[in-house]
């Protein structure tokens, strides 16, 4: 996996200083209240200097949401097949009205911004979010802080951040978060580069599916037959693209000709978010993008869109240049804003994302806010699917609270309760859990009701009593939810056929399956599936093959990305067991069964 700067960023995930997230009223200093604070520069970054005061930077401010509990219950009701409101998704307008903050909240924050010269006219208001661009000089006064340029020691990339920010006392009760400020970490594609290699195959003929995976292997293993999704604008398949990864049309076309000739002529749209480019002739690595489109579309045949979101490229030397703001985006937030602003008719039905990062490396408020935004997509009928990660029980394996406690590391957003997390398997006859499949238990998000019985059974009956006590949170959201093949997928990239491994393969594979299931439901005048998890853990569970062999590993003593020394935990693993487990979830899809269950 690599960072949003296209290089390994594991160094910044080890020993990241503790993030102290306080309620806005917890700290007071000269009429300012501290919102968020780091206790030092995160490991893997060095402070370089100060940006020019005139440097422009775009900020997104999250207002305190007064209806969080009500909204979360609404999402669960809409997604629960046993509830009367199942499938009654909210429109863009209904969601906006439901979450709209009071005039008092907005006025208080607008008045504070205006006091520093940021007029209401220059602020874009979007439900409970405000977006504005201002100079570093103004931002430093506004947030009572100093911004600095920080360089990543692994790849040389630079970002502008601060270690602490505050808001005026008059606005403090109404401000939940402002970014980009304290978030240094960056998501990575969930690819295991160790298993990337050239392949000498030109079609699915005579392929040993125990050695190499092709679309035909998946169709046979998961009993998909020759079923594809109808090209229906109500069932658009969305694929997330970051890191200047460009999905190349010529590679995709060749892949389809080689492995899915029945879909000859199939293509996908490209949508640019925050100025993302669509470089079809780039020499940069695009393995992740290729893998995603090859298998999500190659399996489903669905009407598809690749959503490219501009990442944080290297800063140019002259920080006065106007495009400096492009290098400080928070890609998840940018993508979520774009999608949630789409009319209902343009929103994807399924969104597949193969990126993640250590949960503890993300500021707590940031992870909470972003997870809630994924919930908003669910409320509007979008199935949000994430790869679980490629670090097994963990790679850094220590806390970032200053104590350096040895522990397993859950992955974000895979551990967000509003997304469907997909772990990895390999082999057929039998299919087994793959060693790098990330899983475990969130330290931020409580275990949701839909998986309570399954996770409680695992902890009480399948996990040896006392095993790994203190290494994980037994009350946290368990992940992954399901699993799929993840080893040596035949993929086309830059004119070559290569074998690629990782849960980056599992997520688009499962997204393709969900797209076909949506198509079946729509053909029977039923709504699309939306947020999947309540259905998966109830009606859908009998449509999965339980994986009971294999397990994950991790905590090997060397970080797999930075190669720095880390705690060694002998035998660290989650085993695949009967029922749900934190390496393969409920198991792998049996399409033949699922296609019937979705009509119940």
Curated annotation (Swiss-Prot):
Binds 1 Ca(2+) ion per subunit. GO terms for biological process: proteolysis. Glycans are attached at residues 210, 281, 323, 404, 575. Pfam families: Peptidase_S8, Pro-kuma_activ. Keywords: Calcium, Glycoprotein, Hydrolase, Metal-binding, Protease, Secreted, Serine protease, Signal, Virulence, Zymogen. Its EC number is 3.4.14.10. Residues 1-22 form the signal peptide. Residues 212-600 form the Peptidase S53 domain. The active site is at 288 (charge relay system), 292 (charge relay system), 504 (charge relay system). It is found in: Secreted, Extracellular space. Transmembrane segments: none annotated. GO terms for molecular function: metal ion binding; serine-type endopeptidase activity; tripeptidyl-peptidase activity. Its cofactor is Ca(2+). The keyword Signal applies. Residues 23-202 form a propeptide. Ca(2+) binds at residues 546-547, 579, 581. The keyword Secreted applies. One of its GO terms (cellular component) is extracellular region. Its main location: secreted. It catalyses: Release of an N-terminal tripeptide from a polypeptide. Secreted tripeptidyl-peptidase which degrades proteins at acidic pHs and is involved in virulence. PANTHER family: PROTEASE S8 TRIPEPTIDYL PEPTIDASE I CLN2, TRIPEPTIDYL PEPTIDASE SED3 (AFU_ORTHOLOGUE AFUA_3G08930). This is Probable tripeptidyl-peptidase SED4. It comes from Arthroderma benhamiae (strain ATCC MYA-4681 / CBS 112371) (Trichophyton mentagrophytes).
